Amino acid sequence: MIRDTINALRAAAGHEIVGWLAPGLTETLDTPDLLAEAGIRYCADWVVDDLPCEMRTAHGTLLTMPYSVELNDIPIMMIQHHRAEELFHRTVAQFDRLYAEAETQGAKVMGLAVHPYISGVPHRIGWLEKALGHMAARPGTLFWQGRQIMDWYLRATA
């Protein structure tokens, strides 16, 4: 199933697939080994830390990419039934904390999981735009995809 998924994504994207995020963060204890065996280099299913971490597998190292269920519009709005501004407040609070910590501890990574059918609708999109604007206004803030974060981390730790 993993290889079939990777092949379908590669065909659609037109480039090699190096990252993985399972639906609903679901996996088994064998999944990291299977992902590494299939050529996946990072996985966002492990909700740990604010920097990538290295996980040893039977087929080499697999990076775990920072991901947060606390900054995910599905639990916030669809399960906990909060209004859209809750995602804004949580995003800004987490960003401000990580930004302050980065001044003395070095770079931080913050994942923000939003879905077009939830946060992208007209009555919610303004709150997302406001959060993104807050972050973009701070010097040194970068908006990267997982592949870019992986490349940066591997260079920084080489």
Where are these regions (language model features)?
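A structural signal for the main folded, soluble domain(s) of proteins
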Residues: 2-4, 8, 12, 109-112, ...
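C-terminal domain-boundary segment and adjacent tail
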Residues: 42, 92-158
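Short, acidic/polar
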Residues: 1-2, 95
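Alpha-helix N-cap and loop-to-helix initiation/capping positions
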Residues: 1, 82-86, 123, 127
